[in-house]
Amino acid sequence: MSVKEINHPLVQHKLGLMREAGISSKNFRELASEVGNLLTYEATRELETETVEINGWNDQPIKVKKIKGKKITIVPILRAGLGMLDGVMQLIPNAKVSVVGLYRDEETLQPVAYFDKVVKDVEERTALIVDPMLATGGTLIATIDLLKEKGCQHIMGLFLVAAPEGIEAVVSKHPDVDIYTAAVDDKLNEHGYILPGLGDAGDKIFGTR
């Protein structure tokens, strides 16, 4: 597993704007999409390509590179992950979208899937999980478990911010999954919020609590 903190100036500038108190839902949502787009560019850097022959503009055969295989399925985790979906799809508009929703069981405190709409051939694709925040890691681990149960072998995660505790939890359970984030923040507080973090990303994206 590799954890890649994307320190590109545009990523860091936009993330800084998102951290400001009083940011509007509109601005937060737009920035989440933009940072998601930039993270996607970095995360797809290592995708395998193959050389194919096509007819060029003058109807002459030429060789070009294309992404190999069935390519990608984007997996936004409800609800906040939807805020990054548009930005990701701007770069890979033909990707299939698999949606996963989870809630936390009050007795076991474990994530339980309440919605699962995963593309049928997920075992042939790279799954790109998108969620604004990686906090405790429980939701991500449950999503990875679900995808692997369906046969998916190549999984990556995109996050605006991540907590060291969550990264450690995911590494211990799924060392083969790569994580891309705009920032590895300091820690979780006693309520499970990332510090300095972004607050509640879902509330800010959708304007509702």
Curated annotation (Swiss-Prot):
A biological process from GO: uracil salvage
EC number: 2.4.2.9
List of residues binding uracil: I194, G199, D200, A201
Broad EC category: transferase
Coiled-coil regions listed in the entry: none
Keyword annotations of the record: Allosteric enzyme, Glycosyltransferase, GTP-binding, Magnesium, Nucleotide-binding, Transferase
Description of how activity is regulated: Allosterically activated by GTP.
Annotated source species: Pseudoalteromonas atlantica (strain T6c / ATCC BAA-1087)
Catalytic activity, reaction form: UMP + diphosphate = 5-phospho-alpha-D-ribose 1-diphosphate + uracil
Binding site for 5-phospho-alpha-D-ribose 1-diphosphate: R79, R104, D131, P132, M133, L134, A135, T136, G137, G138, T139, D200
Domain of life where this protein originates: Bacteria
Protein name, per record: Uracil phosphoribosyltransferase
Function: Catalyzes the conversion of uracil and 5-phospho-alpha-D-ribose 1-diphosphate (PRPP) to UMP and diphosphate.
Family matches, as InterPro entries: PRibTrfase_dom, PRTase-like, Upp_B, UPRTase/APRTase, Ura_phspho_trans
GO MF annotations in UniProt: GTP binding; magnesium ion binding; uracil phosphoribosyltransferase activity
Signal peptide start-end: none
Annotated cofactor note: Binds 1 Mg(2+) ion per subunit. The magnesium is bound as Mg-PRPP.
Essential cofactor(s): Mg(2+)
Pathway assigned to this chain's UniProt record: Pyrimidine metabolism; UMP biosynthesis via salvage pathway; UMP from uracil: step 1/1
